[in-house]
């Protein structure tokens, strides 16, 4: 009995399901012998329309039963060799199968003559087999690796002709595959026609029409089939609906399944512009907007500057100087009262800017010695002032790392600096050009000055008039609403700002904290989670609103400590630097004078890490970048005499909070720890940022895959939208960057697994728990659709469980890549393992084949319009939501089967194995699923918006406004910070080695590789095992009956 319990998917092992799951129901599939798996799979047409057949989960919901598998540790599963998803040649149309006499006898009770005909048709297919390829994990991250695809693939996206040839050849390869399948289909139809009953001439006539269509498609060229395949599929779909259940309708489904391979390719290519040299150049321009740095997988945290684009002499001359820190600026010195600069110095800056604007047009500025001399004069005056200043006031020695600028900040300035830095970062988040970023910083400085002036926070009598005069420069649309300022306090300030916590930061990165505020309290415990349920520190991207900043500035900031005139000087310098055209003569000298001015302003600042220091450092960094660019593009001989002085300026600029050469993030800034999961279109790795110690999840995608799909512009457009938003049920994006071959997306790290992993263990969920999960999914889809984004690839794998137990939807910006893999390659993922003498080994190998190909070949969650290759919209997501709800309640998708073409036929027929209603499912849940799974998209629930879904009786009692604040039924309890054992990937199940590895310390040798990661309450464990046995017996009984 104990051995039997261990075989039942390892449910006897400890697992981590909370006691909040009141009624645990388990999945209907098991790893034991089944009547269906005792022999080869034989496809048969559906004859009884009301037949309810519960099919075992055929794509990865099962674990191995061997004893060696149970001894592997969590980490060894990933370090061991695994089988890649494309480790074999494209399979043929079908594989041979030998049906046992007992099974045929049982099926004969409920089948007619048509069934025997279809069995003989299936037996005509030749046998085939696949080799189980092995690929080392060490090649996962490299630019090379993977298995060759059946179509020509370019070696680099820079080779335009080779790339375009690869793009155009995709449909040609699809045509060749379809022709082979059509040839087999024609032979099968001929054999079926010979045995048809002569008393049914209608069936014979329809079969002849199918023969004519198949032959015509085979005779067409690739161009002709591309132009006519959509109309052919639409006509076949219409005729199929008119057929009655039987052999002819099954033949219609088979032909549709073959031809939709072409229509899906056409659909994805039609949604974008034709692939030619012009569109490819547009793509390259779009891709170049993402910063590209060469990848270096070494352990050194140094950034590889080989791809910076600057000449060698400039990197040696200036680049190395930016890596040295001015430690004197971090030392604590005695503070004296600040002497306000006289009006002459302040007016000099404005006169210099006015002279440049008046004498030379702004769109084509030029510079002469007077303007440059004016800038140097201002710098000399600042230097004279600084000679009488002892230094900056730091007031303490404790420092912490800001999660935004990643620089050390005095502890007592952490709260205001975090807000100011986030606000400054907002100025540059959507700006690419240096001049645009300078103008944005200048605009925000003007708003700060306006808020100070309008509330009488001035230090000079005539300052207010000058500020009011300048206020017209700022953008009117970005001006704050004065009436809202006083209505918002400190809590309102942080409404849109990330919490300043160091959730799950390594101890080596934490600092002693003595701050007695809300922010300081968060820092005191390094394992405090964020309010969003993420382990990733969430203080690095979200930024406050304009009115929030002014409210905080007026109510919380100490105005006497920040000099208003220095802010005005920073604004002038940023404006002058942005108006400089470095293609004109004298631009280098002028920018260098601006850099000297800003360095003088920074030296006069009394407080570190506040407005002057934060904005000034960012402006200085941008000016340095512009200066180096100007030196690269211009050969101004007049600047040769100032080389020594410019070197001093560049060397001093290295003390700014932002280093110039480190402005753009790359993969070298992260330490790759281990893989988390593998998906249909990318791999996800757990990584730690070297500077802060924060954990992130990095998704790695191949550039060529995106180019091959010809959908890069939409992907980048969705990414640009989602990277700036924050929603409690969507996974956050933090960074995106590229190397030569890959695109990297850095997302928040959620170590609670996903709904697929949860269902993998518990089988199915109570309706109350499923209602909350689906309600959160509805809100996520509602938000995505408001951004004009269709997910298209919704499934339990993409619903991650956050640290607080709530779900977060992922892959929404890149789901179309996975969708293409899921739909185009459906027909190539068939179980074609040759029969073995040992039925147990054959059943195990057959199951492994289905698991290995499931993630890229299952159409379980796809809407009919996507499978048929027709136009689709938001309604496709609501279809998938209905599939997910059915799976949460029953444990299996409604249309699942052992082969993709059978799933395809089930979806078109709408045949579902409903559980007992209302015993196992309520009437409200059944009605919601029925209305979501309507074949016509315009009639589907949700076609007119999410409001009609939210108003369904199934969601009665759901508090939509406070759903994210409710306590979740299942809250993950990871063993450590970097514990990824809650993830059970569809790929990882077939990728792990069957042999025990040597690294198994700290784990139970008797626990299964997936099962041992959950900790289940003893009562729930016993209940789950008992329930599992009941469902397994019921499952076998249903198989025998039907």
UniProtKB/Swiss-Prot annotation:
Zinc finger residue extent: C2H2-type: 402-421
Domain Protein kinase: 670-955
Domain spans labelled AGC-kinase C-terminal: 956-1042
Lineage: superkingdom: Eukaryota
Listed transmembrane segments: none
Class in the EC hierarchy, top level: transferase
Record's keyword terms, sorted: ATP-binding, Kinase, Metal-binding, Nucleotide-binding, Phosphoprotein, Serine/threonine-protein kinase, Transferase, Zinc, Zinc-finger
EC nos: 2.7.11.1
Annotated spans, Disordered: 1-75, 90-115, 297-327, 830-850
SMART domains: S_TKc
Single GO molecular function: zinc ion binding
Basic and acidic residues bias spans: 1-10, 102-115, 314-327
UniProt KW Signal keyword: no
Reactions listed under catalytic activity: L-seryl-[protein] + ATP = O-phospho-L-seryl-[protein] + ADP + H(+); L-threonyl-[protein] + ATP = O-phospho-L-threonyl-[protein] + ADP + H(+)
Residues that, per the record, bind ATP: 676-684, 699
Pfam families assigned to the protein according to its UniProt record, in alphabetical order: Pkinase
Modified residues (Phosphoserine): 854
Residues annotated as the enzyme's active site: 793
Presence of keyword Transmembrane helix: no
PANTHER family linked to this entry: SERINE/THREONINE-PROTEIN KINASE, SERINE_THREONINE PROTEIN KINASE IRE4-RELATED
Similarity annotation: Belongs to the protein kinase superfamily. AGC Ser/Thr protein kinase family.
Name this polypeptide is given: Probable serine/threonine protein kinase IRE4
